[in-house]
Amino acid sequence: HFIFVVEGVLMYFYEKQVRQLLTRLADRFSGSEVWFDVCGPMMANSKYIKPDSLRGHEAQIRSGLKDGHEVENWEPRLQLIDQALYQKFFPKRWGLGGRLMGLFPGICKKFSSLLGYKIKSLRPVFVRGHPHHLFKQTA
């Protein structure tokens, strides 16, 4: 089993490409975990709000999401472990404004968060000795 950490990468890809990557990881690495950061819709859709790392660069954020459970709909083998808010990490870095914003998770998720997923296996359900078209999730 592996832990994949994909930090600062996926937001630069289109949603379709992110979905493909997550499906390929789920195909090959059952029982593993994948962690990645996402930009929320406020950051992904804004020309004016950018992460510090993009200021002065032409790179574009191409995808973003607010709710980590959305990924479970894309790929049913991914089970959300946590959607962590950056305001919980290193509170002194964020200052008073960031700490206050951290009290409102819904607002924070509009900008960015860290998502962690367990990759579960889907095994076929057998009906009368033949694989059924539906799959049963296993941990």
Where are these regions (language model features)?
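Short hydrophobic transmembrane-like helices used for membrane targeting/insertion
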Residues: 125-127
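Intrinsic-disorder-associated, low-complexity terminal segments enriched in Asp/Asn/His/Tyr and depleted
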Residues: 130-133
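Alpha-helical subdomain
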Residues: 1-123, 139
